[in-house]
């Protein structure tokens, strides 16, 4: 089987992934990380791009918030976040898109300033080297919180007690959350465990053969599970994925 895999990770923020014109979303990233860690596959290239074109404070704050959805999978031996700045050269896809005033922000290069002035004059610096822009200070906050997750261990268990499904979450081996998951919530977790699911398919599955349940109940259950960081989905309930693994069923 596979021992190591490289994949396009790039960000924990849906908006940033769109700004970088990526075809994947954060739900895809969760799915990939979840099952790679389950099967012991190393992910050495979980690169997080900082300084992306169009990046805003709110995007970095979303990245910080979304770190918690991956809390069970931080393992420096398997899955490590690498924060790297976006670098632009004249053959980069973004180079032609950026107006000159925006390109001026990309002025950081370790070598260019060492060149003699005579060499630099009249030369398109982007033809010689790639450059990055100054980093937003919020990335330092992201880095510190990211390190916190790697320095501590989250775990969980799912059990059945008197016919009830009980979810227990621990932080550094100490229980911190105990939650009864109703039949509908547990069905959602199982349906979204092994694939990224759309809202129509999930609602259809939840309503099949079940009286007294409508779409509103399903969306309310999804909201609660996301509030507890047990499922993730983007705006409009698209791309739903369970954060936890429901196989084996109880452990």
List each model region and its residues.
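Short, well-ordered loop/turn elements at secondary-structure boundaries
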Residues: 1, 161, 226-227
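Conserved non-cysteine loop/helix-boundary elements of the Radical SAM core domain that shape
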Residues: 1-76
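Active-site proximal loops enriched in glycine and acidic residues that flank catalytic Cys/His/Asp
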Residues: 9-16, 21, 47-50, 90-92, ...
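C-terminal scaffold of the Radical SAM
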Residues: 38, 57-187
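Short loop/turn segments at secondary-structure transitions that flank enzyme active sites
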Residues: 52, 94, 231
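Short catalytic/ligand-binding loop motif for oxyanion handling, primarily in non-cytosolic enzymes
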Residues: 53-54, 96-97, 241
């Amino acid at each position: 089987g596979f021992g190591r895999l490289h994949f396009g990770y790039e960000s924990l923020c849906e908006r940033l992934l769109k700004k970088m014109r990526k075809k994947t979303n954060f739900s895809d990233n969760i799915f990939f990380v979840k099952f790679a860690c389950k099967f012991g596959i190393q992910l050495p290239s979980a690169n997080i791009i900082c300084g992306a074109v169009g990046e805003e404070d709110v995007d970095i704050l979303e990245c910080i918030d979304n770190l918690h959805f991956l809390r069970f999978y931080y393992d420096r031996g398997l899955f490590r976040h690498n924060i790297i700045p976006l670098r632009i050269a004249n053959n980069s896809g973004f180079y032609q898109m950026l107006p000159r005033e925006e390109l001026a922000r990309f002025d950081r290069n370790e070598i260019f300033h060492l060149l003699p002035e005579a060499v630099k004059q009249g030369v398109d610096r982007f033809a010689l080297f790639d450059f990055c822009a100054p980093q937003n200070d919020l990335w330092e906050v992201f880095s510190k919180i990211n390190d916190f997750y790697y320095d501590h261990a989250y775990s969980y268990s799912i059990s059945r007690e008197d016919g009830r499904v009980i979810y227990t979450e621990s932080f550094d081996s100490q229980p911190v959350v105990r939650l009864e998951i109703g039949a509908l919530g547990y069905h959602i977790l199982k349906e979204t465990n092994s694939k990224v699911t759309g809202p129509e398919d999930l609602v259809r599955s939840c309503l099949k053969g079940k009286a007294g349940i409508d779409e509103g109940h399903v969306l309310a259950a999804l909201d609660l599970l996301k509030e507890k960081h047990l499922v993730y989905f983007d705006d409009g309930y698209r791309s739903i994925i369970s954060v936890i693994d429901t196989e084996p069923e109880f452990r």
